[in-house]
């Protein structure tokens, strides 16, 4: 208990995660800074689109830009950026440090009815565009409810849907003018002494301005005044044609922009991302309240487990001690096995309890605790052990990956400025953790009596990664048919296959060889009988369905609030960033402790009901909270989200199911290992003749 308290205290000290800002880039007055365009996305859809591929925006002209970059050139992306749908391209927008541009003409784009329809569809679904300057996403500026602080929401709207003034169908207004406000600060150190500056803010203010009343350069006559909006509808005056008999089928859209540079004296470069997290700071009290409630739940469970371990089980072992010791009737088919000393690990040597070894006699079964009657079957290999072992191995692989991601995120190595870093590093950790997957899978497989360890290697390396890859590939076909940037390019699919077969597979093989050949099976204090014991019928509350739902609800309550914030960031409001990794790390630690305690209690009551099928049971109990997590996702879909379209809905439920399956595998593995250590410990305290 003291050890648990100290661990939680340490984690509480780091609940506010920070980020490592990296290396700044400074600019002199007159330096050209490239503006990169990325993608458009919406809270109402799971489909994203590359900005430059939209049929109604200005296509790149191929002009040379800053740093010898050519407009239209794609920026090299990491694996995580590709998987999250990024398509970053150099634009034709020209930004020169320190030089304001009141109005500048970009281009005029003539679109047909299909282009108008696509623009209306994206505006109706609330799509926003993501642009990037100096690795900062263009943001829409807001004020807090008390108007004391300003904060950013990444992206800006493509347009607005309004009610027609004539009372007819809704009108769609396209934002064809943007005012770009670049905020800068004096560069730190010697660069600042040389007059250099760093970018600390990038604000975008979009407007819709009609195509009429423009000068010969395509600029509005008075940019600061009120203007009629640009309505997305074919217009006869979009061309010089005088034929009024035919219905207009095209619309010409002029694009302009303004640039203003403003010094920000109070915001330094290393804190420039704080503007995107102000909204999260307001919710810190909710995080703290949830953390306290999670600690209370964990503390209550700890008390229950303490009673079970220190009182109930100890009294079970000591109970009727004199009677059993005086009525020893040795049986030739039972032998006392002394546990061998292994290297220290979770499933290592069985520690001695402060109790004397007890001699059990089957004829005295009515006078001893029910769980001790299972000594001849408790370590019997489970059904489908060849499947359980790879699942446990993959669960350990995910556990190492999740731990690494949480540590790196809490330390600030993984942060929003490292775009795609969370996914890229996660894949890397998962692949290289294959060696742990093979090691644990092989040892458990051999413990179950398996001999074909090469077959176990194939199952371990292919089962979970193969199912994930196959599901993502099938979903990718639907996304590809929608021409979305979320669709994985063919080269990325090949790269993932290479990582899987050429990197992870050999690592799983190496770990399996070491675990199977060098370390061997885990030892058990009691040998299984030749004839299995019959399992009695259970009461209704001990049946699997009810038991899993009840056991899973407690861990779900621990993670509920953090899950709510994650769902909000991923689906409800995609313009926000989730960066409360300090809270997430602490809640994750509490979750693991809760899963362990719930599994121990459930396993104990299972054994008390004279059921020795605890292997799969402990795995299922540990992962049972995933049922509630998926139920919450479904609830959010129908009550909080506004996702429309068959493909987007399918992607939501499919990716939600994959996330819950991974979560179940991870927590199920934790539950299994806890139950395994628990069972070996309590049965190691008795000696059977």
In which residue ranges do the predicted regions lie?
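Soluble extramembrane domains flanking the early transmembrane region of eukaryotic membrane proteins
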Residues: 3, 13-295
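Cytosolic juxtamembrane regulatory segments of membrane proteins
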Residues: 25, 29, 319-333, 522-537, ...
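Hydrophobic alpha-helical transmembrane segments corresponding to the first two to three helices
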Residues: 274-480
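Membrane-lumen (extracellular) interface motif
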Residues: 283-288, 396-462, 466-498, 559-585, ...
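Single-pass alpha-helical transmembrane segments
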Residues: 287-306, 499-506, 589-590, 594-597, ...
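Transmembrane-helix exit/juxtamembrane "anchor" motif
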Residues: 302-320, 505-523, 594-608, 666-685
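Membrane-water interface at loop-to-transmembrane-helix junctions
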Residues: 374-393, 490-497, 528-555, 576-587
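Hard-cation-handling environments
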Residues: 483, 517-519, 526, 539-542, ...
């Amino acid at each position: 208990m003291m050890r648990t308290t100290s661990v939680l205290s340490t984690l509480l000290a780091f609940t506010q995660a920070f980020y490592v800002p990296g290396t700044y880039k400074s600019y002199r007055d007159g330096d050209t800074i490239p503006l990169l365009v990325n993608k458009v996305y919406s809270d109402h859809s799971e489909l994203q689109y590359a900005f430059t591929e939209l049929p109604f925006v200005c296509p790149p002209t191929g002009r040379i830009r800053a740093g010898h970059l050519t407009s239209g050139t794609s920026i090299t992306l990491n694996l995580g950026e590709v998987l999250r749908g990024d398509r970053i391209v150099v634009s034709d927008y020209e930004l020169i440090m320190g030089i304001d541009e009141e109005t500048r003409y970009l281009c005029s784009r003539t679109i047909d009815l299909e282009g108008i329809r696509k623009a209306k569809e994206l505006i109706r679904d609330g799509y926003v565009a993501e642009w990037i300057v100096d690795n900062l996403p263009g943001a829409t500026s807001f004020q807090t409810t008390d108007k004391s602080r300003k904060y950013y929401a990444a992206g800006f709207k493509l347009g607005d849907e309004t009610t027609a003034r004539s009372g007819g169908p809704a009108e769609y207004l396209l934002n064809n003018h943007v005012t770009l406000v670049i905020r800068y600060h004096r560069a730190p150190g010697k660069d600042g002494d040389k007059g250099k500056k760093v970018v600390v803010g990038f604000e975008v203010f979009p407007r819709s301005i009609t195509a009429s009343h423009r000068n010969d350069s395509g600029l509005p006559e008075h940019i600061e005044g009120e203007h009629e909006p640009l309505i997305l509808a074919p217009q006869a005056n979009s061309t010089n044609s005088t034929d009024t008999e035919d219905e207009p089928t095209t619309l010409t859209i002029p694009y302009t922009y303004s640039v203003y540079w403003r010094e920000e004296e109070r915001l330094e470069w290393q804190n420039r991302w704080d503007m995107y997290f102000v909204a999260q700071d307001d919710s810190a009290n909710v995080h703290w309240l949830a953390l306290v409630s999670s600690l209370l739940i964990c503390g209550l469970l700890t008390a229950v487990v303490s009673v079970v371990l220190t009182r109930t089980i100890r009294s079970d072992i000591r109970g009727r001690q004199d009677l059993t010791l005086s009525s020893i009737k040795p049986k030739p088919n039972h032998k006392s096995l002394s546990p061998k000393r292994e290297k220290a690990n979770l499933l290592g040597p069985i520690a001695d309890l402060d109790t004397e070894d007890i001699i059990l006699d089957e004829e005295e079964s009515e006078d001893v605790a029910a769980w001790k009657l299972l000594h001849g079957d408790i370590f019997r290999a489970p059904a489908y052990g060849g499947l359980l072992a790879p699942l446990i191995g993959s669960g350990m692989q995910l556990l190492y990956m999740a731990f690494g991601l949480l540590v790196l995120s809490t330390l600030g190595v993984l942060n929003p400025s490292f775009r795609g870093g969370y996914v890229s590093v996660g894949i890397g950790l998962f692949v290289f953790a294959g060696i742990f997957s093979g090691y644990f899978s092989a040892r458990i497989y051999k413990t179950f009596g398996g001999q074909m360890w090469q077959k176990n290697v194939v199952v371990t390396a292919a089962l979970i990664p193969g199912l994930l890859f196959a599901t993502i590939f099938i979903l990718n076909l639907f996304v590809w048919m929608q021409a979305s940037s979320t669709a994985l390019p063919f080269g990325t699919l090949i790269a993932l296959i290479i990582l899987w077969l050429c990197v992870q597979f050999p690592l799983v093989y190496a770990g399996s060889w070491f675990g199977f050949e060098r370390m061997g099976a885990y030892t058990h204090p009691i040998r299984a009988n030749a004839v299995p014991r019959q399992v009695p019928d259970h009461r209704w509350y001990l049946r699997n369905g009810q038991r899993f739902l009840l056991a899973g609800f407690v861990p779900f309550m621990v993670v509920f609030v953090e899950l709510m914030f994650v769902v909000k960031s991923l689906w409800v409001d995609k313009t926000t960033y989730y960066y409360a990794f300090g809270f997430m790390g602490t809640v994750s630690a509490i979750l693991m402790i809760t899963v362990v305690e719930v599994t121990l209690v459930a396993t104990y009551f299972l054994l008390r009901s004279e059921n020795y099928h605890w292997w799969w049971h402990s795995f299922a109990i540990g992962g049972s909270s995933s049922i509630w997590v998926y139920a919450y996702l479904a609830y959010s879909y129908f009550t909080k989200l506004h996702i429309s379209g068959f493909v987007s809905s399918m992607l939501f439920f499919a990716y939600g199911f994959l996330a819950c399956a991974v979560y179940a595998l991870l927590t199920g593995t934790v539950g299994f290992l806890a139950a395994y250590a628990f069972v070996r410990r309590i049965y190691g305290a008795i000696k059977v003749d």
